[in-house]
Amino acid sequence: MLLKEVIDNSIDEFKMKSGDRIEIDVEDNLRVSVRDYGRGIPQGKLVEAVSMLNTGGKYDSKAFKKSVGLNGVGLKAVNALSAHFEVKSYREGKVRSITFEKGELKTDQTDKTKDETGTYVYFEPDNTLFKNYSFHDDIVETMLRNYTYLNAGLTIMYNGRRIKSRNGLEAVSYTHLRAHETEAI
């Protein structure tokens, strides 16, 4: 569920036509990074956007009527439930990086960058809250494949592997119909 909340923000960027690529890496089935190439979180609001309730950038915004995220609550929940949480916002030639440990701000730094705009989130769920957890590759890959079917043109890189659906659900429907057509004959 935590991973889904982070990815939903990236999907919202895609739906707003701000980035068509998302990169997800899972380390040792315990830690996750998600990088999108959308607009990036406004750097002046970055700490608030990931740690203070009722401060999400999508809250009350007509631009996000089709938002799949939790309107500003998702990243805050991931932060609160993580032993380590890091977010970077790339905008206007700068990257602002902040790090939290168990919800407490530890570092906040802004530097110049030539990297593309977007957002990077890295987190490790708190094992005192989630006993014996791990991210299961098959479940994560199925979830990501579903995202590409529901969002034609979206490219997701998962641990270096490309997951893409050119035609979204249209391709799934065609494949499904062809399979049943063969069975009927």
Predicted segment positions?
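Active-site catalytic microenvironments for nucleophilic, acid-base chemistry
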Residues: 13, 84, 88, 182
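GHKL-type ATPase core
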Residues: 30-33, 37-40, 45, 58-170, ...
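Conserved short strand/loop->alpha-helix "switch" segment adjacent to the catalytic nucleotide/phosphoryl-transfer site
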Residues: 1-4
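Hydrophobic residues in the alpha-helical elements that line and stabilize the ATP-binding pocket
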Residues: 6-9, 74
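Conserved small/polar residues in nucleotide/adenosyl-binding loops
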Residues: 175-182
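Conserved beta-strand-loop-beta-strand hairpin that lines the nucleotide-binding pocket
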Residues: 8-59
